[in-house]
């Protein structure tokens, strides 16, 4: 779900009562400060800021606010000037700030002075009530269904909604199909459940099928909201958390995939089993391919947040050359978030690491940097068809 339903187009201003602008040090930085949050907000709540400066990502780890004495603050790393729009969230658009009735509100707006240095101070009145929040119409195609609203994740001691896409000819054929596993399932198929836009994976695959592609089954697992960072990194980040990625990948490889293979006409081998994600989902997809190359033989890594877990580089360098080698498809943008050079640099470093292990460019390894690419759903939606075709083609 997008902020104010249309986060980028919505230009309504909202100045929170009591907002204060204060002079800041002579640096091109903006500090955002919350002096209070709604009663009942957990003491250990992860509060994020999402805005036009980070692609409206509701749970970007580098935009998590720091708690201090009952208040929360963050200083943006990137220079900003002029008007900015933003909202505060608890890690998803289903838990963004709202009004006292639990409904969505317009984006906050603030014009940074010409120096680019300022502090915005405000308060959150309430968090959105998902039960009363208006939602856009569903955009999922007929091939999409909910495999389970509460699929057991024994490895993590919780449940999760899991989505399923079946190819157009699944019901009328006896074919077996490759399977692609995706993260952040809320964003994969349906605008009614997505935040900041959906990928349109179902429409993309339907179109490719109409042009002669053999088709694929897609299994998309919802992220866990405030558990997202924990589940999408095998290693702890001192500031942002993490550390449950091993268990999450074990769930995918040992529980979810066997279930799908038992109940649907799949081609279960690694050459027909892919995993793909963006940002933190890109990080955990890469890790899944390294840990289980005999399971996930096709790996899509979009805008990977490798900075979150630098241990991924030593993990890749230590890969056993005797094990199967997956195909890895990397894509990142030259305009990624607050520090695009970090994403470009880290992708290049990982590609060099894999090439040093013998992965062959063009057949086992593909990497591209898109000049216009940003850390945003529209970018990943656009890049999906090319990644899918490269991973499963030939």
Residue ranges of predicted features:
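Aromatic-rich carbohydrate-binding modules that target alpha-glucans
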Residues: 37-83, 91-113, 148-153
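A domain-start/cap signature at the N-terminus of enzymes
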Residues: 105-177, 365
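Gly/Ser-rich "nucleophile elbow"/oxyanion-hole loop immediately N-terminal to the catalytic nucleophile
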Residues: 171, 175, 234-278
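Short beta-strand element of the alpha/beta-hydrolase
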Residues: 174-186
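Active-site machinery of serine-nucleophile hydrolases
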Residues: 186-253
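Primarily recognizes the serine-hydrolase "nucleophile elbow" in alpha/beta-hydrolase
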Residues: 269-323
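C-terminal catalytic histidine-bearing segment of alpha/beta-hydrolase fold enzymes
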Residues: 331, 337, 342-352, 356-394
